[in-house]
Regions:
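Short hydrophobic beta-strand elements that form part
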Residues: 14-18
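Acceptor/aglycone-binding surface of glycosyltransferases and processive sugar-polymer synthases
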Residues: 66-83, 100-176, 203-223
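Short beta-strand-to-loop acidic/aromatic patch adjacent to the donor-nucleotide binding site
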Residues: 86-97
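Short loop->beta transition adjacent to catalytic acidic/histidine clusters or analogous donor-positioning motifs
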Residues: 12-13, 33-42, 50, 60
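Hydrophobic helical membrane-anchoring modules
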Residues: 1-9, 123, 146-148, 171-274
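Short, well-formed alpha-helical segments that are part of the catalytic scaffolds
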Residues: 20-35
Length: 274
């Protein structure tokens, strides 16, 4: 497990965690990020357990929404971040496989000029099923060809970027395929991508990735991303940034729990729960 120096001066950076049924694992992730001086937003994607309650108790602000997939939860978190003035988001999973102590590594790469920083996992093949090893190799090759530059780990959920970047891309994915689309579309738009080696914390959680359906979604994401680029799609104008959020140095005393309601013409409408 790689070590990283404690982060200072993280004003304007919000950690965003899309989460689904992560009650047994999410609290250490939230506390680890807070220890790095990073405020935390958890987007609870329709969990059937106590993910929202556990995350709020650990110090996170929580958005609760109907289940729509990881990609939808990420976009919801980015929209919330922009609306509340956050300049950068650190995206990571809530299952404990990403080490919060490595957050400074991604942040440093972003400050070094990269538009999108991806944490490249040091995967241990002996811990993976054969189909997963083959898929990882094939996916890296296909995304590299589609993006026009080498992308070693297009499936990693540990990322750092301006939230408006994701909102400016013509994304269609709602699940894990969104992360693949982001890599391809960002690279083809001429944005600067960087990959930073990170460790992986293995646990006994059953993967939420469906071997057949999510593999098909991956191939569709690659084809559709290339097609959208050939169709002349370009980055949309970046959304206006709200008044910059103040620096947060500690967890809020009473974390807010917010519901997200679907609305016509918008993917989600934020409303404070009663």
């Amino acid at each position: 497990m790689a070590d990283a120096d404690p982060t200072t001066g993280n004003a304007g950076i919000l950690a965003v965690i899309p989460a689904y049924n992560e009650a047994p694992r999410i609290a250490p992730v939230v506390r680890g990020l807070l220890a790095q001086g990073l405020p935390v937003l958890v987007v609870d994607d329709g969990s059937r357990d106590h993910t929202a309650r556990v995350a709020a108790a650990a110090g996170a602000t929580v958005l609760r929404r109907a289940n729509g997939g990881k990609g939808t939860a990420i976009i919801t978190g980015c929209r919330w971040a922009v609306a509340h003035g956050w300049r950068r988001v650190l995206l990571l999973d809530g299952d404990g496989q990403h080490d919060p102590r490595e957050a400074p590594l991604l942040i440093a790469a972003g400050r070094g000029g990269a538009d999108l920083v991806i944490g490249r996992r040091s995967l241990r093949p002996e811990r993976q099923p054969r189909y997963r090893r083959c898929f990882n190799r094939l996916s890296s090759l296909l995304v590299t060809l589609a993006a026009g530059r080498q992308v070693r780990d297009s499936q990693s959920g540990f990322r750092f970027c301006d939230p408006r970047l994701l909102l400016s891309l013509p994304l269609a994915g709602r699940r894990y395929d969104l992360e693949t689309e982001v890599c391809i579309l960002a690279a083809r738009a001429g944005l600067r991508l960087a990959e930073v080696p990170i460790s992986v914390i293995y646990n006994d959680k059953v993967s939420g990735v469906h071997p057949l359906y999510d593999t098909l979604r991956f191939f569709r994401a690659v084809v559709m991303s290339v097609s959208r680029c050939r169709g002349g799609h370009r980055l949309a104008p970046l959304p206006a940034m709200a008044t910059p959020a103040p620096a947060v140095t500690a967890a809020p005393a009473a974390p807010a729990v917010t519901r997200v309601h679907p609305g016509p013409g918008l993917e989600a409408r934020l409303a404070t729960a009663r």
